[in-house]
Amino acid sequence: MDEHESLERILDGRTWDDFCDSLKDARTALFRESSPANAFDRAEGYRHLSRLLRVALERFVEHADPEHPRFYQMARADAKLGADNPDCCYRNCALDGRREYRIRGQRGTSTYLGIGTYYGH
């Protein structure tokens, strides 16, 4: 899909329709045979999906500009991602491998500060 078609899809609403259809498809995980079928667990499943949606919007919409990166907290108590450590404070930001960045700040009382880079999505 070229840029012109992408813009047309935004203008005529197809992009939004596709987004909403993908949200409908996301619920299929809650209805697998192996998934609990009681009201409490089903509601928790919807809650978890809505939190994952919020995390995705924060990452890919609100904080996706590598020309103006800013740290934000993706994994947190109200948005668990599965393998986060409760003793750690995770921060993320979008970067471009073709650019150079400088991080400034104070480490404070932290005994360890680790920085990792990852390629792709």
Residue ranges and their predicted role:
Residues M1-H121:
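A compositional/structural signature for long, glycine/proline-rich flexible linkers
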